């Protein structure tokens, strides 16, 4: 019972942190490198994009799952920030619940 209440509380906290995402734009911190200014990501979920995701070290990191997520976001939502933010919310909620 305590474990379930704690999981629910953490999920609620995560939802609270992301609540304003519906009206937010892309941010200037790193979204240009990761999404809006990246031709591979903007091209969506393609075979060449998938191959690029696994060999890319752009932004100084090798993280193909992050790139695959961005590729899929652009495929599904284009450059509409709310969709990208919803994906982040789902991923963070999933990670929160994986604690249990």
Task: Please provide the spans of the model-predicted regions.
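Structural signal for membrane-spanning alpha-helices in multi-pass inner-membrane proteins
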Residues: 14-21, 74, 99
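Residue-level signal for helical boundary/lining positions with a hydrophobic bias
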Residues: 10, 26-27, 84
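Single, functionally critical "micro-switch" positions that shape active/binding sites
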Residues: 13, 29, 87
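Start-transfer (signal-anchor) and selected internal transmembrane alpha helices
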Residues: 1-16, 97
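Extracytosolic (periplasmic/ER-lumenal) interhelical loops and adjacent juxtamembrane/interface segments
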Residues: 21-78
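Membrane-interfacial loop-to-transmembrane-helix junctions in polytopic alpha-helical membrane proteins
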Residues: 2, 76-83
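General alpha-helical segment detector with a strong preference for membrane-spanning helices
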Residues: 18, 34-35, 92, 96
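Transmembrane-helix motifs of polytopic, lipid-linked glycan transferases
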Residues: 86-100
């Amino acid at each position: 019972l305590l474990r379930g209440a704690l999981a629910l509380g953490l999920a609620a906290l995560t939802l609270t942190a992301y609540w304003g995402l519906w009206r937010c734009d892309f941010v200037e911190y790193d979204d240009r490198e990761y999404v809006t200014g990246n031709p591979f990501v903007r091209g969506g979920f393609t075979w060449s994009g998938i191959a690029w995701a696994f060999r890319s070290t752009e932004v100084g990191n090798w993280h193909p799952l992050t790139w695959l997520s961005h590729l899929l976001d652009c495929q599904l939502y284009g450059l509409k920030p709310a969709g990208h933010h919803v994906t982040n919310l789902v991923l963070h909620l999933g990670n929160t619940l994986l604690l249990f």
